[in-house]
Amino acid sequence: MPKQKTHRASAKRFKRTGSGGLKRFRAFTSHRFHGKTKKQRRHLRKAGLVSSGDFKRIKAMVTGL
């Protein structure tokens, strides 16, 4: 049986946290900031954690995490 390949796009987008979770960056941060409030822009700068429902799928795609 061949080894499972890592999904490279996912490997670049997610990092493992110290407690075992997956850190992700937020969407809607590339342009059109004039339509967003200052509070929205500030919260979009912070990284988020992957939800438990998505965790299993992403972990299967990224074998090295």
Curated annotation (Swiss-Prot):
The gene is rpmI. GO terms for molecular function: structural constituent of ribosome. This is Large ribosomal subunit protein bL35. Keywords: Ribonucleoprotein, Ribosomal protein. It comes from Streptococcus pyogenes serotype M1. Residues 1-20 are annotated as: Disordered. InterPro entries: Ribosomal_bL35, Ribosomal_bL35-like, Ribosomal_bL35_CS, Ribosomal_bL35_sf. Residues 1-16 have a biased composition (Basic residues). PROSITE patterns: RIBOSOMAL_L35 (PS00936).
